[in-house]
């Protein structure tokens, strides 16, 4: 099996290396990842500037490709020909932090995986809750990612489905099962912080308290709050079918 691996935290992220080592048990892994951090970069693509790809070495000495574009650029370039073969699976992660609920709209990790769906390749995004904290252990999340990837291939996951996987912190004894979930409700508490530079010109930071979410039963938030791995199947058809029907009853003409 040929696997394309990317992320949004950058090619030298410890989460990516841990995931690569596990996925190599399933097949050949090609890494094409951003050269810098693109967290919350969403599905941006570079259209009005050149993109460059350079070979780098990961911490274990293995080769990888670093791109100066976004996570979606990395996967897009790989699929357009930077890889010399079409992958069977696109995997993105392990993200240094959760991608739950509304996070999927902002997440570069999810966007990299979603780019695989654009060209009809089944994909998986993997995130470790609180993975940004010093000393985070990615081994449990990487092991779960390998198992989920193997199952996705065995079940012939459709090529228009992305599995958004969130793994809670904890040992294998604590994080010992998974739940299939729906997206929950993320609560953001963003605040605009305005400051002045030394020349008196304003600049802004987006700050505020850390976001949380509603741990409702059946949701990704509920699963990880109870030490379960959350597996949420996503696709990019965002059509609200109820309102297709309701809006169709309106009069849409120039009369």
Curated annotation (Swiss-Prot):
It holds the Pfam family SurE. One of its GO terms (cellular component) is cytoplasm. It comes from the Bacteria. It catalyses: a ribonucleoside 5'-phosphate + H2O = a ribonucleoside + phosphate. It is an enzyme of class 3 (hydrolase). A divalent metal cation binds at residues 8-9, 39, 95. Its main location: cytoplasm. This is 5'-nucleotidase SurE.
